Design a protein with these regions (language model features):
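Active-site-proximal, substrate-binding regions of enzyme catalytic domains
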Residues: 1-118, 124-154
Length: 154
């Protein structure tokens, strides 16, 4: 099974490598699919945010760099899907100005059989868009959310 992780999963939940995906999704094998748009979203958070989100984005980007560029193995295979070329008509018709739509468009044009793809997100709009387009969807259990660090006052 191919699983597409939305950026909110990568930023707000424990490491994708610590989640028992086979148990969560009731499958034998999992390949993590990273799209160009998700990587851009992570890079933007790494460059523009401050504090915990920036730190988390840097860690996520670094791990994917180790795996995809450095050739290091991870717990799960990772596949990179570059942003697909879209004509002006496709950009308008599929509303590709929305990042979620671009992610789904990229997967559809990657050559993967969408019957083998599950979109994992905590974003209701993303899950609805994916479901409407025929993808399997999965909302990750909150037990995998990163623990909030106590504030200085606590």
């Amino acid at each position: 099974m191919y699983i597409v992780l939305d950026s909110n999963i990568l930023l707000h939940y424990i490491s994708f490598e610590e989640i028992p995906w086979q148990d969560e999704l009731s499958c034998d094998e999992v390949t993590i699919v990273l799209t160009g748009m998700v990587l851009e979203e992570i890079d933007k958070k790494k460059d523009d945010e401050k504090g915990k989100i920036q730190k988390r984005a840097k860690a996520v980007a670094s791990r994917f760099k180790e795996i995809l560029i450095g050739g290091k193995s991870g717990k799960y295979p990772v596949m990179f899907v570059e942003s697909a070329y879209a004509t002006e008509d496709e950009r308008r018709r599929f509303h590709l100005d929305r990042n979620d739509n671009q992610i789904l468009f990229d997967i559809r044009n990657s050559g993967l059989d969408i019957a083998d793809v599950t979109v994992v997100s905590s974003d209701t709009a993303m899950l609805l868009r994916a479901k409407q387009q025929g993808y399997k969807i999965y909302q990750l259990n909150d037990k995998y959310l990163l623990q909030e660090e106590p504030s200085k006052d606590e």
